[in-house]
Curated annotation (Swiss-Prot):
Transmembrane parts of this sequence: none
Domain F5/8 type A: 32-330, 351-685, 823-1142
Tissue expression: Plasma; synthesized in the liver.
Record protein name field: Coagulation factor V
Length: 1459
């Protein structure tokens, strides 16, 4: 018998010991135990550290009290030395797949804090996050470690969460304190976590495959939200502001792994740029890393150009606020390992491109044509020069291309409207050399800086914030009237990757003062192409048309020419107040290619053409620019989407196939300014080129128009002056210097002289969008927009018969005949007005109790038929949808018909993303030149009905076999911003063929749709103007009382997210908010991959505006977990929910048959005779052994079970009964359930009807089991018989488990616990029987079927060895019968240990004394007790205290493994 220790122990220390004493069992299987000793401690932090001699003279105003993570030696007495570069960041934690990370944490601060990882496998007591997950005290110690206390966190790096095949060697995540996300982060509690592939780390933790690795955190600290408040907003890299980040060091030809973290407690984006360098991210070549607050990125870079290079976020406010540092690349004598030697044949393909570009000052008209459809308010604010505003014309500087170095002959006579304000397109493929002869014809210094290629310092053309004036070279700032030549070669390390488009989109601009130069107008597009992507004419080989769209925000208030513009265009310049918010706003121009409104001309394309779009975001914008393409989809990075998100100063290349006739809109999705200013219409037309074959007549004009877009060399010399495109002696010399030419191949020189004839000129112009050239040169140059057609775009559309009414069925039929393999799916959806309540609020401190939470809104609701009389009630599968409209499901090649009824009080419509539709089913209003017949869909009046018809082409669905369904959205498009904030939005799921069942649900997958949105009720149609926030509140940034961050419109408490462990769960995530609505989704305890991109592991998912993401998860940890945004302020205010993972073996009898459920817990609407409800127990015996009732007309009988706690129910077993020889049974039934006994829900399941009817019994004895899916959580269950034989009769068992999980049998009854693992103080043995401890198994049959001790006294015990640390949550006890003697234990206590030596009694939490449990009252019944808190132990003993006749025990233990 072991030694007992019952001396009082402090509760927290006891629980901590219990939680981690079993760690040794986990060490055996670990590839490596990586131990870290980390403390949270107070530190005075200076964001702008001064040199030591200066810091002694004055105390910085940028010193703040922070809490930071620091690494210590084992005894927490000596802090470990750390890299100065790490700044505020905690130590970088690293682990390979198979490792275990053990973090010994001590809190030296004055606030409770924790450590929570964004990605790792952990148990509840290593999560480091506090929320209502139903766990016990022992599992909550990690949530918030008090000051002065310690805790040990254990994280497992499993293959399931490790980097996938396509991932880099190490993935970047963050760890941070999760007690209060906003205050903890702003106080400084954050560090980096690198999860790496097996074998990728050296013994010291560094990466094997890189020369260097660096962690940089781009962050915004709001010191007013620090625990130690001091108003200040700091824009930093690793906590350093104003360029004080210590220089990042590298050697030429180093391969560097970058681990970049973005953090802010409010929504924030970062455009991370390394001047003069290119990077590779996820197998795509980039020059700017797109980063959002709360997410991380891993990228790599190979460097070759020496010098000191700027590291910055190109978001204008970040640069101005000092978020920058430097990368210092030195020549360390390393060999060039980056440049591949070329054969002579490869060398011959190298081209030298020479451009002559000038900076010139012009008067720019942002809206030369203002269509009548332009919004009046927008026009008054931005385009009119009333109220002493400047208006739409401004003096600006632009890049202009010339034919030669004389700069007297522009490549065009009149400024081409199609290009807008952009400079000429610069194109080059890998290994080409580009020379830009730049002449500054403006009145102040300018330069040219290019993105996306590696350049030397003399070709950089950029002035840094810290550059002293004496160090500004000629190339960095070209003075007025001066000329400078920028020259560089596109290196192998700059080449687009295999996954990239043929040409990737970059930009160039002046960078003397980047913000002001761009605001003045100096921008242009740059294409970096693969080595075979361009023809010798500079035209893309794999695209019919190349199209550029630059979404630029010109802040004219920051232009060099503001004073000039005020003097020239304001009616009373002397009275202008430049700091007046209205005046300032009027000068911020949202443009597409420099145009701030729609144009009367329409960009035109041929039907079936493949258009390569190059889209870029430029300017002072500090938000994402979501670009929406109507009627078509972008193919970008292997994914079809109709919204592309552009980060500031970055570009995307996308392919669009013109396959939908009509006039459509390319526009920015989001704010009023963006959607009105950043837009252009384009025509997808099916017509014959009437001028085909007339090239000779148009020869001269063709030359002129080709000149505009083809490379300068082509323009510079015609037939009489041919262009030398490739290798000449000079280029060979350059190639040799760069190591590109093999010595053995350098034996001859080659001149590939090409002459451009007129046919080629016209071909180039045609590829660039110019279909025909008529009339004079001047006329053509005034109308360069491709196919700027004035005629009716639909005149030749064979689908339209103006004499007949629109018939939706005919449209659907035509689609189906075209495809010949789809189905028609019909939906009936109405817009209805409701009162929506955002309460209950989960955290009272977040919002004032007096704040209004109930608002009038409009929502989409599904109906059963076209009468719109009977709503289609949502069931368990729809419970989580909240404010979302019904899910519209279809398979690829289907046709969707939606009959829409507007039951609201104002016009609404339906607009679908991702699907194919005619103009008559678009559901959006703009000047698309449609006939009236095609405009009826734009806005359906109140009480009106309209049928939308949408086709599902293959591009709308999953892209490969691993993807099951793809998500899109629909919403009202009358005014998308106001309509969505009013509540009118719903999901579309497009699935593979055969994935949808007869009930219109997906087969064999569990799916959820989550809509992340900050609802701004002030943007709703129904919000009273009198209640809106005042202008003063908006100016000072007061958080609106009327904004509600929520998931599916429900803050904190979204219901219905229940799933099984290890099943495939598909989450469809939507974000249709504005440009600043950025959410980073984190599922605690789980990891996931994006559908179609399973080769990449995700820990968190950035969800950008207009994003529809489908992710796949295999939940590995049972319990209730937190789903949230990593944007702290939104998380704190309600953008979070709980999801429950249930054990796949959650089908345990809940206790009707065993008697655990007592008679008093069973009730009914009535009964007949002695057939009382308490008898309704499965397999009950006796004359009266069931519940039975006589059903009377108009009565609806029921039987109810009160489980006395909320549990998970996954199945129901039913049985009838026999009365003499008569069978009594229920043939069919449905059931209802409730959590409180007041509000009852009818189970609907997969059925489309109002309730699901279950098949009952076919006789009075057979057991029928029905599976309940989805599983439900309830306390009360009622069964309602609807069909029966003779009488409604039930014997019942409910199947399920505990909500908290960890409630599966541990193996006594099943035999999983071996006989040798069950021991006792003694056991009874006679000549005819032996009552050994191994017989103490629940429900064991036989003559000797339990454990009996040798003697009956209080010193006896039964012991079970569970072999490893186990969480034990409950116990069932049972007695036994010997002959006619009934034996059972009436009371008992529990002791446990982890070392089989020092035993501890289980204590009563109320008295802190040993708890005595009530045992059995008979020999065969079951009694179940729950351990709250649970026991964490390997060994457990049951000690009988009192008994009936003799001690006899049969038991089962319930729980789960700890690790």
């Amino acid at each position: 018998m072991g030694r007992y220790s019952v001396s009082p122990v402090p509760k927290c220390l006891l629980l901590m010991f219990l939680g981690w004493s079993g760690l040794k069992y986990y060490e055996v299987n670990a590839a490596q135990l990586r131990e870290y000793h980390i403390a949270a401690q107070l530190e005075d932090w200076d964001y702008n550290p001064q040199p030591e001699e200066l810091s002694r003279l004055s105390e910085s105003d940028l010193t703040f009290k922070k809490i930071v993570y620091r690494e210590y030696e084992l005894d927490f007495k000596q802090e470990k030395p750390r890299d100065e570069l790490s700044g505020l960041l905690g130590p970088t934690l690293r682990g390979e797949v198979g490792d275990i990370l053990i973090i010994y944490f001590k809190n030296f601060a004055t606030q409770p804090v924790s450590i929570h990882p964004q990605s790792a496998v952990y148990n509840k007591w290593s999560e480091g996050s506090s929320y209502s997950d139903g766990t016990s005290d022992v599992e909550r110690l990690d949530d918030a470690v008090p000051p002065g206390q310690s805790f040990k966190y254990v994280w497992n790096i499993t293959a399931e969460i490790g980097p996938k095949k396509a991932d880099p060697p190490c993935l970047t995540y963050a760890y941070y304190s999760h007690v209060n996300m906003v205050r903890d982060f702003n106080s400084g509690l954050i560090g980096a976590l690198l999860i790496c592939k097996e074998g990728s780390l050296n013994a010291n933790g560094s990466q094997k495959f890189f020369n260097r690795e660096y962690v940089l955190m781009f962050s915004v600290f709001d010191e007013s939200k620090n625990w130690y408040r001091k108003p200040s907003l700091q824009y930093t890299i690793n906590g350093f502001a104003n360029g004080t980040l210590p220089d990042v060091q590298a050697c030429a030809y180093d391969h560097i792994s970058w681990h970049l973290i973005g953090m802010s407690s409010s929504p924030e984006i970062f455009s991370v740029h390394f001047n003069g360098q290119t990077l590779e991210q996820n197998h795509y070549k980039v020059s700017t890393i797109n980063l959002v607050g709360g997410a991380s990125v891993t990228a790599n870079m190979s460097v070759s150009r020496t010098g000191k290079w700027l590291i910055s976020s190109l978001v204008a406010k970040h640069l101005q606020a000092g978020m920058y540092g430097y990368l210092n690349i030195k020549d360390c004598g390393n060999p060039d390992t980056l440049t591949r030697k070329l054969s002579f044949r490869e060398l011959r393909r190298i081209m030298n491109w020479e451009y002559f570009i000038a900076a010139e000052e012009i008067t720019w008209d942002y809206a030369p044509e203002i269509p009548s459809s332009v919004d009046r308010r927008y026009k008054a604010q931005y385009l009119d020069n009333f109220s002493n505003f400047i208006g739409k014309k401004y003096k600006k500087a632009v890049f202009r291309q010339y034919k030669d170095s004389n700069f007297t002959k522009p490549t065009y006579a009149i400024w081409p409207k199609e290009r807008g304000i952009l400079g000429p397109v610069i194109r080059a493929k890998v290994r080409d050399t580009i020379s830009i002869v730049f002449k500054n014809l403006a009145s102040r210094p300018y330069s040219i800086y290019v993105h996306g290629v590696s350049v030397s310092k003399d070709a950089e053309g950029a002035i840094y914030p810290s550059d002293p004036k004496e160090n500004i070279t000629h190339g960095k700032a070209v003075e007025p009237g001066q000329v400078y030549t920028y020259k560089w070669t596109v290196l192998d390390t700059d080449e687009p990757t295999v996954k990239d488009s043929e040409c990737i989109t970059k930009l160039y601009h002046s960078a003397v003062d980047m913000t002001r130069d761009i605001a003045s107008g100096l921008i242009g597009p740059l294409l970096v192409c693969k080595h075979k992507a361009l023809s010798v004419k500079g035209v893309q080989n794999k695209a019919d048309v190349e199209q550029h769209a630059v979404f630029a925000v010109f802040d004219e208030n920051k232009s060099w020419y503001l004073e000039d513009n005020i003097k020239k265009y304001c009616s009373n310049p002397s009275t202008v107040k430049k700091d007046d918010p209205k005046f300032y706003k009027s000068n911020v121009m949202y443009t597409l290619n420099g145009y701030a409104s729609d144009r009367t001309e329409v960009l035109g394309f041929h039907q079936s053409e493949v258009v390569e779009w190059h889209l870029t975001s430029v300017g002072t914008v500090d938000e994402i620019v979501p670009v929406h393409l109507s009627g078509h989809t972008f193919l970008s990075k292997g994914k079809h989407q109709d919204i592309l998100n552009l980060f500031p100063m970055s570009g995307e290349s996308a392919t669009v196939t013109m396959d939908n006739l009509g006039t459509w809109l390319l526009s920015s999705w989001g704010s009023c300014e963006m959607s009105n200013g950043m837009r252009l219409r384009f025509l997808d037309a099916n017509y014959d080129d009437e001028d085909e074959g007339n090239e000779e007549e148009e020869e001269d004009d063709g030359d002129i128009f080709a000149d505009i877009f083809i490379p300068p060399e082509v323009v510079k010399k015609k037939e009489k002056d041919p262009v030398n495109f490739v290798s000449d002696p000079e280029s060979d010399k350059i190639a040799k210097e760069l190591g590109l030419l093999d010595d053995e191949d350098n034996q001859e020189e080659s001149h590939n002289v090409q002459t451009e004839d007129d046919e080629e000129q016209l071909m180039i112009a045609t590829m660039l969008g110019f279909r025909s050239f008529k009339g004079s040169v001047a006329e053509e140059e005034l109308n360069l927009t491709a196919l700027a057609l004035e005629e009716d775009a639909h005149a030749s559309d064979p689908r339209i018969d103006s004499n007949s009414a629109r018939n939706p069925d005919d449209i659907a039929g035509r689609y189906l005949r075209t495809i010949n393999r789809g189905n028609k799916r019909r939906y009936y959806i109405a817009a209805e007005e409701v009162l929506w309540d955002y309460s209950p609020i989960g955290k009272s401190q977040v919002r004032s109790r007096a704040a209004k939470t109930t608002f009038k809104k409009a929502i989409f609701r599904s109906y059963l038929d076209d009468t719109f009389q009977t709503p289609s009630t949502g069931g368990e599968y729809e419970k989580h949808l909240g404010i979302l409209g019904p899910i519209i499901r279809a398979e690829v090649d289907d046709v969707i018909e939606v009959q829409f009824r507007n039951l609201a009080s104002r016009p609404y419509s339906l607009h679908a993303h991702g699907l194919l539709y005619e103009k008559s089913s678009e559901g959006r209003s703009y000047d698309d030149k449609s006939p009236e017949l095609f405009k009826k869909d734009d806005a359906i009046m109140p009480n009106g009905t309209y049928t939308y018809v949408w086709q599902v082409p293959p591009r709308s669905g999953p892209t490969d076999n691993t993807e099951k369904c793809k998500s899109w959205a629909y919403y009202s498009g009358v005014n998308p911003e106001k309509d969505i904030h009013s509540g009118l939005i719903g999901p579309i799921l497009i699935c593979q063929k055969g994935m949808i069942d007869k009930y219109n649900r997906t087969i064999d997958i569990r799916e959820f749709v989550l809509f992340f949105m900050v609802f701004d009720e002030e943007k709703s149609w129904y919000f009273p103007k009198s209640d809106k926030s005042t202008r003063a509140e908006k100016l000072i940034g007061v958080q609106s009382r009327h904004t509600f961050p929520a998931i599916n419109g429900i803050p904190y408490q979204l219901q219905g997210l229940t799933m099984y462990k290890d099943e495939n769960v598909h989450w469809h995530l939507l974000n249709m908010g504005g440009p600043k609505d950025i959410h980073v989704v984190n599922f605690h305890g789980q990891t996931f991959t994006e559908e179609g991109r399973e080769d990449n592991q995700l820990g968190v998912l950035p969800l950008l505006p207009g994003t529809f993401a489908s992710i796949k998860m295999k939940p590995s940890k049972i319990g209730t977990w937190l789903l949230e945004t990593e944007v702290g302020e939104n998380q704190e205010r309600g953008m979070q929910a709980l999801f429950t993972v249930i054990d796949k073996d959650c089908k345990l009898p809940m206790g009707l048959a065993s008697g655990i459920i007592q008679d008093s817990q069973i009730s009914a609407s009535g009964h007949v005779g002695y057939w009382e409800p308490k008898l309704a127990r499965l397999n009950n015996t006796g004359k009266y052994n069931a519940w039975s009732i006589i059903k009377k007309e108009h009565e609806h009988p029921w039987i109810q079970i009160d489980l006395q706690r909320q549990v998970v129910i996954t199945g129901i077993q039913t049985q009838g009964a026999m009365q003499l020889l008569k069978h009594l049974y229920t043939v069919e039934y449905f059931f209802t359930y409730s959590k409180d006994g007041q509000n009852w829900i009818t189970f609907k399941g997969r059925h489309s009807e109002t309730q699901m009817h279950f098949e009952g019994n076919s006789d009075g004895t057979t057991v029928k089991e029905n599976h309940i899916d989805p599983p439900i959580i309830a306390r009360y269950i009622r069964l309602h018989p609807t069909k029966f034989h003779n009488r409604p009769t039930f014997r019942i068992e409910l199947l399920g488990c505990e909500v908290e999980g960890c409630s599966v049998p541990l193996g006594m009854e099943s035999g999983a616990i071996k006989n040798s693992e069950i021991t006792a103080s003694s056991y009874k043995k006679t000549w005819w029987s032996s009552w050994e401890p191994s017989l103490a198994r629940l429900n064991l049959k036989g003559r000797t079927n339990a454990w009996q001790p040798k003697v009956n006294n209080k010193d006896q015990w039964l012991q079970i060895d569970l072999q490893h640390l186990t969480k034990i949550t409950s116990i069932i006890t049972q007695g036994a019968t010997s002959m006619t003697t009934s034996m059972y234990v009436k009371t008992f206590s529990i002791h446990y240990t982890d070392d089989n030596s020092t035993w501890k009694p289980y204590l009563d939490v109320r008295t802190s004394m040993e708890k005595v449990f009530t045992g059995n009252i008979n020999s065969d019944g079951h009694v179940k007790h729950f351990f709250k808190p649970p026991i964490l132990s390997r060994f457990i003993r049951i000690i009988p205290k009192t008994w009936n006749q003799y001690i006899a025990l049969r038991i089962e233990l319930f729980g789960c493994e700890v690790f």
